[in-house]
Amino acid sequence: MAGDKGGYRQINSSLNICAFEDYLKSQTDNLPELPDVEQITPRVLRVLGQNPGKFTYQGTNTYIVGTGKHRLIVDTSGGEIEWAELLESTLSSLNISLSHVLLTHWHGDHTGGVPDLLRIYPHLEHDIYKNEPESGQQDIVDGQIFRVEGATVRALHVPGHSDDHMCFILEEEQAMFTGDNILGHGTSAVEDLGTFMASMQRMLDQRCLTGYSAHGAVIADLPGKIRTELANKRRREKQILLALGRVRQRRQKSITVEDLVTEIYGESMDESTRTLALTPFTDEVLRKLAGDFKVAFEVRAGKRRWYSVE
């Protein structure tokens, strides 16, 4: 995958993604090893994408779903020939054929393997499904059902990480293929925090028990993981609102995002953490709070200065 970005460079333009390694290292230091191929349940076979990295962790998880000869696959890794060869040999050894290809979203570490799939399995030409499809692909709509022997899969449109992001619910297991919305380890980058949090609640409302993420290990307690994600986001919102309240108490009308980071975290952090992680993350939360009409900004000397409206 070029630059090991996996599509993330488009998510937050203020984030210097190439210099983000210190933050990512904290999420990837203690990752468990995952086998290249693992039968997770009688209905779910995981094939690792052979693309490990800072953003993909152990690699993109691709899932073969069903119990019969004809099964569907969720995601296709990033175009690594090693994945295509591993998938082909695995399916051949099990006498399995593919009938549908379901893509969670547009990022390259999920869609890059499609050309290899079509080269190996040309019968799939009209069976590549994605929300907001590209040329030659079929659309996925919210609530759409895909059936193969032993598996009923329901599509769920849950944007936030990306506008087109779909999760897929395996009805027989009360399990969800969570894509990049919920990861097996750490937390996901998002395009729109408000939309993402609404999607988290919608995912929680499905009452699924287990999560099969696109990156990392199986999520044994999916509701707990989603609640933790929501709680962490809400805690950051509260932290920012409290800091803006202190600014107002000092009779200071407004504050830049850079000064707000100092207000919250102090002066002692290293500059790379401040500018490459905390500042863009704080800006992301401020934009969400502005959408909730809890904060606003004025522009002075060409810079946004934020204040609480509560």
Swiss-Prot record:
Pathway(s) of this molecule: Pigment biosynthesis
Top-level taxon of the source organism: Eukaryota
InterPro entries noted in UniProt: LACTB2-like_MBL-fold, Metallo-B-lactamas, RibonucZ/Hydroxyglut_hydro, Sec-metab_biosynth-thioest, WH-like_DNA-bd_sf
Residues annotated as binding Zn(2+) 1: H105, H107
Co-factor: note: Binds 2 Zn(2+) ions per subunit.
Active site: D109
EC number from the UniProt entry: 3.1.2.-
Induction of its expression: Expression starts 10 days after infection and shows an increase towards the late stages of infection which correlates with the formation of the sclerotia and thus the pigment production. Is directly regulated by the cluster-specific activator CPUR_05433.
GO biological process: secondary metabolite biosynthetic process
Keywords: Hydrolase, Metal-binding, Zinc
Binding site for Zn(2+) 2: D109, H110
Cofactor: Zn(2+)
Molecular functions per Gene Ontology: hydrolase activity; metal ion binding
Enzyme kind, highest EC tier: hydrolase
Catalytic activity of the protein: atrochrysone carboxyl-[ACP] + H2O = atrochrysone carboxylate + holo-[ACP] + H(+)
Pfam families (UniProt xref): Lactamase_B
Function: Atrochrysone carboxyl ACP thioesterase; part of the ergochrome gene cluster responsible for the typical purple-black color of the ergot sclerotia. The ergochrome gene cluster produces several ergot pigments including the yellow ergochrome secalonic acid and its derivatives, as well as the red anthraquinones endocrocin and clavorubin. The pathway begins with the synthesis of atrochrysone thioester by the polyketide synthase (PKS) CPUR_05437. The atrochrysone carboxyl ACP thioesterase CPUR_05436 then breaks the thioester bond and releases the atrochrysone carboxylic acid from CPUR_05437.
Record-stated family: Belongs to the metallo-beta-lactamase superfamily.
Name used for this protein in its record: Atrochrysone carboxyl ACP thioesterase CPUR_05436
Organism: Claviceps purpurea (strain 20.1)
